[in-house]
């Protein structure tokens, strides 16, 4: 009997999901993306060679693994084709292994224009989107007016819908945002060119997943972004436009929760965030700069510098509850090497002095101060360790304390960027 394993982020994204998905796909017949778009950036390092994936599931670098893009993913055809071409230039066979749901919404040029125009108009109050058109594409989906991958293969129907959409969106772009209109014919011609390339890769992904399940195959579900960026459970409004938590798996793939066997929460050994929004443990001192430098904390999609701070057990407890986490994978432990002391946030103190748990929206974070528990650091290197016994005693104590504070077991520890720099204590597919 096969197992269905989920890999998702428990913080604000950038937790190191790509490496872990790549590591675990050794046991998987298929990997499926179920939400987000090319705003994701999953970095894989294999034998020292770095590859960044945005839309294509991280299993593509494992020979023979089927890669599926589910209905919950918003697909930018131009970005997808660029990614396919780059991988093919490296000798990776993509088209015979990649399949895309016809129900996946399309991101087109007017979505990108709207996204960027809105951020520009917000000025200092900007949310910090990637400007890739993700939000506007999900808006069209929910408003039941969006174009989907399957529409690409019906030219007349596509053209009629596109004309209506451009009338609607160009009115906003020109009259409200004072930006140029998007050209209908150019957009149509581009989309029809992409249609010819995408048609062989279209497949009913939901049906395929259930066929694999019934055949007893192991399947991996690859999340994008992090739990605290979830449209419903994140630090709203500083969130993404999809459900990054476990609930998004079923809606974005068509595989019900009863069939999910193990949910692995990828968790960085410290905390980072890109863009605007609350971040209680953020560091503005030399330690924060050290974490950013050692951890190479720059967004793989946008190149923006990530904000860095101490580990926050409060937000992790919330993520564990919301996602029904089975086990934690602790990443970037080696970045903490050499720090004399390490702080863990165990609660938030409000203006009345009461210690509380994580709020549900961004405004409620105003005025909260982190309550820290100080732990000794370690001088020894953890880089490349492959067994728990190789880690310094202080590092093992740090890991144990995180388990105690969160109530979840740490099943995997990442000690470096390469797939073999990993300690596996309990395998999700076992």
UniProtKB/Swiss-Prot annotation:
Positions bound to GTP: 13-19, 41-43, 306, 332-334, 414-416
UniProt-annotated catalytic positions: 14, 42
Organism of this sequence: Pseudomonas putida (strain W619)
Protein name according to UniProt: Adenylosuccinate synthetase
Lineage start: Bacteria, Pseudomonadati, Pseudomonadota, Gammaproteobacteria, Pseudomonadales
GO molecular function: adenylosuccinate synthase activity; GTP binding; magnesium ion binding
SMART domains the UniProt entry points to: Adenylsucc_synt
GO biological process: 'de novo' AMP biosynthetic process; IMP metabolic process
GO cellular component labels: cytoplasm
């Amino acid at each position: 009997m096969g197992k269905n394993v989920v890999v998702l982020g428990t913080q604000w994204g950038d937790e190191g999901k790509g490496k872990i998905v790549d590591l675990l796909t050794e046991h998987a017949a298929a990997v499926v993306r179920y939400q987000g778009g090319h705003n994701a950036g999953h970095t894989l390092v294999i034998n020292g060679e770095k590859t960044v994936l945005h839309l294509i599931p991280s299993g593509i670098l494992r020979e023979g693994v089927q890669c599926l893009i589910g209905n919950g993913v918003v697909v930018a055809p131009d970005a997808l084709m660029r990614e396919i071409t780059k991988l093919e230039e490296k000798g990776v066979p993509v088209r015979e292994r990649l399949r895309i749901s016809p129900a996946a919404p399309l991101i087109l040029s007017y979505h990108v224009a709207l996204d960027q125009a809105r951020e520009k108009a917000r000025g200092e109050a900007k949310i910090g989107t990637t400007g890739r058109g993700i939000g506007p594409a999900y808006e069209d989906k929910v408003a039941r007016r969006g174009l989907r991958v399957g529409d690409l293969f019906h030219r007349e129907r596509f053209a009629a819908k596109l004309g209506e959409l451009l009338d609607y969106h160009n009115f906003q772009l020109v009259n409200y945002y004072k930006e140029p209109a998007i050209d209908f014919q150019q957009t149509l011609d581009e989309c029809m060119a992409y249609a010819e390339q995408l048609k062989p890769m279209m497949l009913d992904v939901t049906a395929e997943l259930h066929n694999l399940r019934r055949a007893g195959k192991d399947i991996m579900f690859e999340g994008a972004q992090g739990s605290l960026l979830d449209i419903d459970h994140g630090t709203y409004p500083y969130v993404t436009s999809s459900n990054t938590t476990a609930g998004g798996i079923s809606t974005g793939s068509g595989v019900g929760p009863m069939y999910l066997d193990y949910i692995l929460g990828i968790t960085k050994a410290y905390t980072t965030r890109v863009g605007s929004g609350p971040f209680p443990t953020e560091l503005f001192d030399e330690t924060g700069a050290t974490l950013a430098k050692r951890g190479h904390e720059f967004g793989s999609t946008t190149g923006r510098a990530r904000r860095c701070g101490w580990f926050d057990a409060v937000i992790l407890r919330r993520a564990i509850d919301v996602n029904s986490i089975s086990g934690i994978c602790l990443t970037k432990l080696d970045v903490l090497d050499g720090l004399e002391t390490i702080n863990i946030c165990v609660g938030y103190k409000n203006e009345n002095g009461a210690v509380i748990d994580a709020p549900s929206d961004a405004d409620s974070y105003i005025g909260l101060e982190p309550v820290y528990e100080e732990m000794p650091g370690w001088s020894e290197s953890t880089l490349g360790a492959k067994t728990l016994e190789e880690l310094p005693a202080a590092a093992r104590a740090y890991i144990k304390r995180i388990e105690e504070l969160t109530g979840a077991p740490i099943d995997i520890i990442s000690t470096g960027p390469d797939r073999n720099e990993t300690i596996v204590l309990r395998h999700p597919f076992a």
